[in-house]
A protein has these predicted regions:
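A short helix->beta-strand "capping" segment at the edge of beta-propeller domains
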Residues: 2-23
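Beta-strand-rich domains and repeat architectures in extracellular enzymes and scaffolds
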Residues: 16-47
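Beta-rich catalytic cores
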Residues: 25-26, 45, 70, 88, ...
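Residue-level detector of Asp-centered blade-edge/turn motifs that repeat once per structural unit
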Residues: 32-35, 76-79, 123-126, 170-173
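Conserved beta-propeller blade signature
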Residues: 36-39, 81-83, 128-130, 175-177
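Short loop/turn segments that connect beta-strands within beta-propeller blades
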Residues: 53-57, 96-100, 143-147
Length: 185
């Protein structure tokens, strides 16, 4: 019997490669829907979300230069709405699964609720969005409507401080973990 996957030299299972029959320029992030894979690309031919199904069929693109300039991270909710952090425009862009713009929130600034080069994002257990507010050296939590719920962190290297936080995730207990880029932690 042939397994539907292979094993990479690193020891991790390798299941399949999607998207090789088309140009995928500078993939940045990936999200999964019920039947589709969403690949966020930027630069070159990118700045869009490519949609591919599990049969490796190209289902087109969503977003593009009219909605975001320098996309970094992608989230997909249960309704397959797409959330993209746009580093250059300092905002979060929300589209439906067909690519129609629902709303955006965020503007450049250092006050709580404003963003300066947002990067990583994750949903919490309630469906709110936790965002790495990279240049402001903090983490912010918003509703999907863009209402600020929480803001924490400051510039520095002490406990509770960040220097260019980039990635963010949350565990089942609600603890938030941050990849603190310039502090190398």
């Amino acid at each position: 019997m042939v397994a539907p996957f292979d094993l990479l030299r690193s020891g991790f299972p390798y299941y399949m490669t999607l998207g090789q029959r088309r140009v995928t320029s500078n993939p940045m992030d990936i999200g999964f829907g019920k039947e589709n894979v969403y690949v966020l690309t930027r630069g070159g031919l990118g700045n869009e979300v490519r949609v591919i199904n599990w049969d490796d069929e190209n289902l087109g693109t969503r977003g593009g230069a009219s909605l975001f300039q320098w996309p970094v991270a992608l989230l997909v909710d249960d309704e397959e709405n797409l959330y993209v952090s746009d580093e250059a425009n300092h905002k979060i862009v929300i589209m439906d699964k067909e690519g129609e713009h629902i709303r955006s929130f965020g503007e450049q600034g250092s006050e709580p609720g404003k963003l300066d080069r947002p990067s990583g994002m994750v949903f919490d257990a309630e469906g709110n969005i936790i965002v790495s507010d990279t240049v402001n050296n903090r983490i912010q939590r918003f509703t999907t409507e863009g209402e600020l719920l929480q803001c924490f962190g400051e510039s520095g290297s002490d406990e509770g401080a960040f220097s260019m936080p980039w990635g963010v995730t949350v565990d089942q207990s609600g603890n938030i973990y941050v990849a603190d880029w310039k502090n190398d932690r």
